[in-house]
Amino acid sequence: MTSAKKLFWVAVAATAVLGYIVGVSPAARVQAAAPSTMQTMPLKPPATGPINVAFLISDGADVMDIAGPWEVFSDAMLTSKGKPWHEADGMDDMLMPFRTYTVSDSLKPVKASDGLMIVPNYSFENAPRPQVIVIPAQNGRSDAQKAWLLSNSATDDVTMSVCTGASMLAQYGLLNGLTATTHHMFAAGMQKQYPAVHFVSGIRFVDHGKVATAGGLTSGMDLALHIVDRYYGQDVAQVTANTLEYRGELWKNPKFGEVKPVVAAR
């Protein structure tokens, strides 16, 4: 087991023990009001070319946080008329509307969770301008990273985080005054660390239109499917989910922002 993974589970265990001692679940210490805004307004694809989806990574980046949304955006296909790919008039009529790539401080291999090595496609100096930015849970912070994210998030369509990737958005001020979510085991700690953000747990994602946050790990797939829906409609997103054999439905549930009441531990 890697040291990063050990630290993760130590934190999880400490959170669980504290919740037992005080007699309530950890989630109970996070404000549990439903998000005030949940964006479903359509996004406009570019007139030409693919939609650039940049995955911002550094050491410790969680593999699932990357792989889930990456597969969603990579497997989304449609016809030249914007219809689901199964309605295409042959292979020549099938388009892949999203272009996925990784970006980091340099092209030096990034050591992701559990030791997986990822060679970034681009550095901050030469990365294409993205329409979508995906921020997985990760350890690294740098001035160059902050400058790139603030510059590109100002002009992109949507910046999304997965799991504790929300801490980067919060640290750089992109969540101030907003409702956000993260992995439920870390929501209470992040609420304390970033009081300008209203953290909620027990939901898959929160979308404010320009910035969106997903819960832990697999929640990133739901948010990615939701973004596909915003660009190309629910039919294209549903066919993408079918291609992935993903059975989750919360990405299209109109009550995806509902927070269930927290029950005290017994």
Kindly label every feature range from the protein language model.
Residues 176-202:
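A conserved active-site-flanking secondary-structure segment within enzyme catalytic domains
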Residues 50-52, 179, 210:
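Residues that mark the start of a beta-strand
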Residues 8, 20-159, 167-171, 188-191, ...:
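Extended, subdomain-level signal for the structured scaffold at the beginning of enzyme domains
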Residues 202-213:
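Amphipathic alpha-helical segments enriched in hydrophobic/aromatic residues interleaved with Lys/Arg
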Residues 1-11:
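Bacterial N-terminal signal peptides that target proteins for export
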Residues 212-225:
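Active-site-proximal catalytic alpha-helix in oxidoreductases
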Residues 12-19:
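Hydrophobic membrane-insertion alpha-helices, especially the h-region
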